[in-house]
């Protein structure tokens, strides 16, 4: 019986040592970086992503945002109207908000009154607007990646996206790589 316990303890110690080594390797490869997958196109959730991003960037943490699916509406420039879209792409363009100013709330949207009230409160309390947050994020070096697959599925084109200094187009594998090397990951 004692021999079995010794073998078991020895096996456990080897497993603990292997895990300790693996965790050490993972921690060593982590950067002071925040990766956020922004999937929701709701005003309150895009605001949350930007507030967290700005806070992290102000603390010298590298920030990488990955905009996918419904959140792409926030990155559409209402002044840009690309040509050559098929019927379904045009319909998505009509049905979805065009730009940050047209986003709705996830709760209490109240036919558009909710976003107006939030924006009024933000202004009254000297909170930056979403446009100002994106401008500051650009100045702080926050990177935004637009999911190419989502963009294609929803019929959006690169020509209709906002002008942003650190904007790139890539797939989900890019976000997985960014998240894998980040000390913090969020999904909004």
Annotate each PLM feature:
Residues 117, 123-149, 166:
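Ligand-binding beta-strand-loop-alpha-helix segment within the catalytic cores
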Residues 47-65:
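Histidine-anchored nucleotide/phosphate-binding helix
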Residues 72-84:
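N-terminal beta-loop-helix "entrance" segment that forms/cooperates
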Residues 122, 146, 151, 159-188:
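Glycine-rich, aromatic-bearing surface loops/beta-hairpins
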Residues 83-122, 126-129:
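A glycine-rich helix N-cap at a beta->alpha junction
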Residues 36-47, 75-78, 121-125:
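Short, glycine-rich nucleotide/cofactor-binding loops
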Residues 63-69, 145-148:
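Short internal beta-strands
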